[in-house]
Design a protein with these regions (language model features):
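N-terminal "domain-start" segment that seeds a small globular fold
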Residues: 1-19
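Amphipathic alpha-helical repeat scaffolds
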Residues: 10, 30-34
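Conserved helix-turn-beta segment immediately C-terminal to the redox Cys motif
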Residues: 24-25, 33-62, 81-85
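Hydrophobic beta-strand anchors of alpha/beta hydrolase catalytic cores
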Residues: 25-27, 150
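Thiol-based oxidoreductase modules, predominantly thioredoxin-like and allied folds used
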Residues: 55-72, 88-99
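Thiol/selenol-based redox catalytic cores and closely related redox-interacting motifs
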Residues: 80-82, 86-166
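Non-catalytic, surface beta->alpha helical segment in thiol-disulfide oxidoreductase systems
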Residues: 160-180
Length: 180
């Protein structure tokens, strides 16, 4: 099974096949409305506006698994994103990305690209310190570590990159551009 064999539910509960995005460059991101990384919505929306007409899509999967930072209903989350960031990209139903109840899309993505570290800088060090308090062995498993982890999928459905929430958004935009 590949990327295009996966599906998720949209905020209204309709099944959305990843096959709908066949031939496009896709960024799948687990999000939250009450996270220190929530302002990344602004940069995600800018990427969407810049590249959507060239075949770029974002699949936004709200998730409440990290310190309960997406506590609202699907409608409340959607309204928050519209009001604060004017997001236009597709937003899915809130879902688990880790554990027994993780949706199939995330099981697949994690099987393709595991955790490779938080990178450099103060935020990366802070995330590493936080994760050590949660799971001393966090570096050894492919699980999603926090909100705003991103997976980049090329036009053929290959998962080509995983970006942790600490990744530079300009670096992500450049990776998207290179695939368009």
């Amino acid at each position: 099974m590949g990327f295009y064999d996966q599906s998720v539910k949209d905020a209204k509960g309709n099944e959305i096949s990843m096959r709908n995005f066949e031939g496009k460059v896709v960024l799948v991101v687990n999000t939250a409305t009450g996270c220190g990384f929530t302002p990344q919505y602004k940069e995600l929306e800018q990427m969407y506006e810049d590249y959507h007409d060239k075949g770029f899509e974002i699949v936004d999967v709200p998730c409440n698994q990290f310190k309960g930072q997406a506590p609202g209903t699907d409608e409340e989350i959607h309204q928050f994103c519209q009001l604060h960031y004017n997001t236009q990209f597709p937003q899915m139903k809130k879902a688990d990305v880790n554990g027994e109840n993780a949706i199939g899309l995330y099981k697949y993505l994690k099987s393709q690209k595991g955790f490779e570290g938080f990178g450099k800088g103060k935020m990366a060090l802070a995330m590493a310190a936080l994760l050590l308090t949660i799971d001393r062995n966090y570096k050894k498993n492919p699980e999603i570590k926090w909100n705003f982890t991103k997976f980049l999928v090329d036009r053929q459905g290959n998962v080509v990159a995983r970006f942790e929430p600490t990744a530079d958004m300009a670096e992500i935009a450049k990776a998207v551009e290179n695939l368009l």
